[in-house]
């Protein structure tokens, strides 16, 4: 199986088929079991991963660093200010140089076009650790978490409430590809990108499931197996924060809203969370919340991705 993935990039959930997503999740589960049992898996012994960060991170940095170490490899942390990128070196040159020294590159940055350019010029696999357009590693962890708690993915309904942002984009594509029903509720003007909606619509049609885009959070959450949200203002949107709080207030995930979901629903949030804004403490700290299991699964999902692309 590894041979079919080796050398590929992972920039978007659309880079994988539904079947491939399931294979990644199966490997992630296997690696998680081995790690819990204390079984060493030095699959990437002698391999180095360059990790470029233009945006601050807790979960992305720790999960990739720990993941590489557990797989026997070496993680190399690089901030934009530490590198020549901050002095105007072209991304193409950075890609060519790093490709001669490392076995893979993970980048967490603002512009999705930067990641695409890096991947175009790099001769080693490039992994999208987050851009303003997608966050595919997060959604691999989310799908792993859903499968662990629900036993399956196909046929479940996932509801997104809030901003049609990068996490929403990756969730729509990933969930649709594995046969889930997808419902997205956003304020007017904050809908997901139309290209993403078209991809998700095509995938749900293939499975015979549904894609719902609405401005009504109750409509989206009704009958949901999984409820997901994110912060109202992402990094780089701080200047819009006050305005966004006003716009998104009706989209808070609270006890009243989730009462419309299935009784055994689970709640996901990529973290960090702002209790009292996009979600209440009642929900995120309640019995239906699996956000910390979700955070842990960043490690296991990314170990699977690293194994397949760099192994």
From Swiss-Prot:
Enzyme class, one word? Answer: transferase
Protein's name according to its UniProt entry: Ornithine carbamoyltransferase
Keywords (A to Z) from UniProt: Amino-acid biosynthesis, Arginine biosynthesis, Cytoplasm, Transferase
Reactions listed under catalytic activity: carbamoyl phosphate + L-ornithine = L-citrulline + phosphate + H(+)
Keyword hit for Nucleus: no
Relate the protein's function as given in its record. Answer: Reversibly catalyzes the transfer of the carbamoyl group from carbamoyl phosphate (CP) to the N(epsilon) atom of ornithine (ORN) to produce L-citrulline.
Record GO biological process: arginine biosynthetic process via ornithine; citrulline biosynthetic process; L-arginine biosynthetic process
Q: What residues does L-ornithine bind to?
A: 166, 230, 234-235
The taxonomy runs: Bacteria, Bacillati, Bacillota, Clostridia, Thermoanaerobacterales
The gene from which this protein is expressed is: argF
Q: In which pathway does it act?
A: Amino-acid biosynthesis; L-arginine biosynthesis; L-arginine from L-ornithine and carbamoyl phosphate: step 1/3
- From which domain of life does this come? Bacteria
């Amino acid at each position: 199986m590894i041979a079919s993935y080796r050398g590929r990039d992972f920039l978007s959930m659309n880079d994988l088929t539904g079947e491939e997503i399931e294979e990644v999740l199966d490997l992630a589960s296997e690696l998680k079991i081995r790690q819990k049992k204390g079984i060493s898996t030095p699959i990437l012994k002698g391999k180095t991963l360059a990790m470029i960060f233009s945006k601050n991170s807790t979960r992305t940095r720790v999960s990739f660093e720990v993941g590489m170490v557990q797989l026997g490899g070496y993680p190399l942390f690089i901030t934009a200010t530490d590198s020549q990128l901050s002095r105007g070196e072209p991304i193409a040159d950075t890609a060519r140089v790093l490709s001669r020294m490392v076995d893979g590159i993970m980048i967490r940055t603002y512009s999705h076009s930067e990641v695409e350019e890096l991947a175009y010029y790099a001769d080693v696999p490039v992994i999208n650790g987050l851009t303003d357009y997608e966050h595919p590693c997060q959604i691999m962890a989310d799908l792993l978490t859903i499968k662990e708690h629900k036993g399956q993915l196909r046929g479940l309904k996932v509801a997104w409430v809030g901003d049609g942002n990068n996490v929403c984009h990756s969730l729509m594509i990933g969930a649709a590809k594995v046969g889930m029903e997808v419902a997205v509720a956003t304020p007017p003007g904050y809908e997901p990108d139309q290209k993403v909606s078209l991809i998700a619509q095509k995938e749900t049609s293939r499975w015979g499931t549904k894609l719902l885009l609405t401005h009504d959070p109750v409509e989206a959450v009704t009958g949901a197996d999984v409820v997901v949200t994110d912060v109202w203002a992402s990094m780089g949107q701080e200047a819009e924060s006050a305005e966004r709080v006003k716009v998104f207030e009706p989209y808070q995930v609270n006890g009243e809203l989730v009462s419309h979901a299935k009784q055994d629903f689970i709640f996901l949030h990529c973290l960090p969370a702002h209790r009292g804004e996009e979600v209440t403490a009642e929900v995120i700290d309640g019995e239906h919340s699996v956000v910390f299991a979700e955070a842990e699964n960043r490690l296991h999902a990314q170990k699977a991705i690293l194994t397949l692309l760099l192994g």
